[in-house]
Amino acid sequence: MNAPVNTPPRPALAIARELAGQFAQTAVERDDRGGTPKAERDALRDSGLLSLVIPQAFGGQGASWHDTFAVVREFARVDSSIAHVFGFHHLMLATVRLFSRPDQWQPWFEQTARKQWFWGNALNPLDTRTVVKHFDGWCEFSGKKSFCSGASDSEMLIASAVDERAGGKLLIAAIPSGRTGISLHNDWNNIGQRQTDSGSATFERVRVEHNELLLDPGPLSTPFAALRPLIAQLHFANLFLGIAEGAFEEARQYTLKESRPWFRSSAASSAEDPYVLRHYGEFWVGLESVRLLIERAARQLDAAWAKEHALTAQERGDLALAIGTAKVAASRHGLDICNRLFEVTGARATHASLRFDRHWRNLRTQTLHDPVDYRIHELGEWALNDKRPAPSFYS
């Protein structure tokens, strides 16, 4: 009798590549349509990737942030909206891990892994229109929130409200998305990231139990808790890089198969034209430099994450510099490639059916999440004055 063969689990990146191939078949059409990518979100649920960063002790895969962001990049090459909500799902999991007690985050992790919950975002700390009203053992959230990425078709939400009784302190909670009083308006209609469901939400006397509030240690209260914004920033850097890599590859295939050399060129094909080659050489230098910066930052993040509450403020500051550097580079080189890809593909590449413009639209939209000038300012403070970035929800 033969012993049973234990098939090892498939690597997450292999699963992601298979899914990305499926997403790519409809990505152009869905970019035009907008709305909620329900079928694609369900495919993510079925894949098991929603538990990627959850430790194995709680039913997850125990992946590193390095490997989790590799999946974000894989999706971003073909569908940056899916990449964004997938990455933000894991950012929400990081939020409860960093801001709450073990008796809170551990059951949430276990249920997420077992039920393949999708987490959405209604935090937006700059939108202070949602306020708290306190009762005995519970409270109410009432008001509006903007930029609620991934909230539609989610099982859980990270939401925030201003506690005017505590001088404007921000209270953050983890609550079921379908709770009475929560309305998701599905009103996202921007030029890019059109299937991220980043529209608005209304909270009408939404009951929040005390054990759903993330109070201990709370937001940004320790160097470890202050990793949350850095995870967000590295997510964006990987998203930017993935979009740029996807744009590069689409342009490359078009140049090789469709483009024609200019009539004054002595080259037999566009692939031999010296000006086209110059552009591709510059694209390559930009992509390689960003890849190296992101690789370094991801390794530093994993090291910081492993230290947990032993992480020092200086180590956290050094990580902020590494991630900030990577994000600025990813933004600049990504926008450059997504704009200049038409220089190497030609006029016919502007045909609406190709939607090559979606790469720039998606990247331009996402890079406006927080101004790159302020990230550069922080890097300048370090370069000139030896000042590390102070923790905030954006740095």
Swiss-Prot record:
Q: What is its EC number?
A: 1.14.14.-
Question: Per its database record, what is this protein's job?
Answer: Involved in the dimethyl sulfide degradation pathway.
Gene name per UniProt: sfnC
Q: Which GO terms describe its biological process?
A: L-leucine catabolic process
Q: Gene3D superfamilies of this UniProt entry?
A: Acyl-CoA dehydrogenase/oxidase, N-terminal domain, Butyryl-CoA Dehydrogenase, subunit A, domain 2, Butyryl-CoA Dehydrogenase, subunit A, domain 3
Checking InterPro entries in the record gives: Acyl-CoA_DH_C, Acyl-CoA_Oxase/DH_mid-dom_sf, AcylCo_DH-like_C, AcylCoA_DH/ox_N, AcylCoA_DH/ox_N_sf, AcylCoA_DH/oxidase_NM_dom_sf
What switches on expression, per the entry, is described as:
Under sulfate limitation conditions, it is transcriptionally activated by the LysR-type transcriptional regulator, CysB.
Source organism superkingdom: Bacteria
Q: What class of enzyme is it?
A: oxidoreductase
Keyword Signal attributed: no
Species source reads Pseudomonas putida
What is the recorded name of this protein? Answer: Probable FMNH2-dependent monooxygenase SfnC
Give the record's keywords alphabetically: Flavoprotein, FMN, Monooxygenase, Oxidoreductase
Keyword DNA-binding found? no
A GO molecular function held by the record = 3-methylbutanoyl-CoA dehydrogenase activity
